[in-house]
A protein has these predicted regions:
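A short beta-loop-alpha structural element at the N-terminal edge
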Residues: 3-15
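Amide-forming acyltransferase catalytic core, primarily the GNAT-like/NAT-type
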Residues: 13-52, 102-108, 115-197
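Short, histidine-centered active-site or binding-site loop motifs used for metal coordination
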Residues: 19, 77-82
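Short beta-strand micro-motifs in enzyme catalytic cores
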Residues: 46-48, 71-73, 171, 224-228
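Conserved beta-strand in the GNAT
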Residues: 49, 55-64, 72-74, 79, ...
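Active-site/acyl-donor-binding loops of N-acyltransferases
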Residues: 64, 108-149, 186-260
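Conserved acetyl-CoA-binding loop-helix of GNAT-fold acetyltransferases
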Residues: 80, 85-101, 197-208
């Protein structure tokens, strides 16, 4: 029988083993797990697991985030053992998640899942894919006019230190793929104005930008942004893309690798 519950300290190695089954692209280890689920600066981190015969076969995590005055969460680290990857296991994990959110009067949970998982969540589990985050590549960036949007993740200095390892105004990360480097703007605070790539010694930047949010999926890859709303009083406002500003660094999928 598959059971669903909140993870404890004794589950860490089992969860790391689960995450490492398909190549461990994100270098999961006991230390990395503790970074997210024990060292996170805000209270209310939860790790949900599915277990079968004393083996962890599924996982979903939530991190509390500061978005306006809402009680908000960010969903992370969804993974199910390929042998058990079916709606029954996903449903059990999300039922645990939903019950916890209702018990704790959460307004909503948001996430940037992979496109396939986003479709599953939207079709079967009450999530809404409200827009897709398209990638822009340009020789400069400016987010100034979008920092007045009401829905964004607010980073304290403690959060910046936890996420990036140091506190500064802007974080440019280098990323190697398919034989070439790209330089990603993971985060810029509202004091950062128009910024040119050549000031960092690179040709161009890659980043998410509200001008590249789109409702319908296109041929080029984009990252879905999805949300599950528990306080329906705010549904209209929360599902309006024009109220959101999401940066690449909001997703833990983008690992910060400094230029120097």
């Amino acid at each position: 029988m598959i059971t669903f519950r909140i993870a404890t300290e004794k589950d860490i190695l089992g969860i790391v083993s689960l995450f490492s089954q398909e190549g461990n692209a994100y270098n999961w280890s006991e230390e990395r797990y503790k970074h997210f689920y024990q060292d996170y600066p805000l209270e209310g981190v939860v790790s949900f697991v599915a277990e079968f015969k004393d083996i962890i076969i599924g996982h979903y995590g939530i991190l509390p985030v500061v978005i306006g005055n809402y009680k908000a969460l960010f969903g992370v680290h969804a993974f199910i053992n390929q042998k058990y990857r079916n709606l029954k296991v996903i449903r059990g994990l999300f039922q645990s998640l939903d019950n916890w959110c209702k018990d704790h009067q959460i307004d909503f949970i948001c996430a940037v899942p992979n496109p396939d998982f986003s479709l599953v969540k939207s079709k079967f589990f009450g999530w809404k894919e409200i827009f897709n985050l398209g990638f822009m590549t340009k020789e400069c960036f400016s987010f100034s006019e979008y920092h007045n949007r009401e829905l964004f993740i607010n980073y304290s200095e403690d959060m910046l230190l936890w996420r990036f390892g140091k506190v500064q105004d802007v974080y440019i990360s280098k990323y190697f793929r398919e034989g070439s480097w790209s330089y990603q703007v993971l985060y810029a605070n509202d004091d950062v104005g128009l910024t040119y790539a050549n000031s960092f010694g690179v040709a161009d930047f890659q980043y998410w930008h509200p001008d590249a949010y789109f409702l319908e999926r296109k041929k080029e890859f984009a990252q879905p942004f999805s949300i599950k709303i528990f306080n329906l009083e705010h549904e209209e406002f929360l599902t309006n893309p024009n109220n959101w500003f999401i940066q690449m660094g909001d997703s833990d999928a983008f690992v910060y690798t400094p230029l120097d």
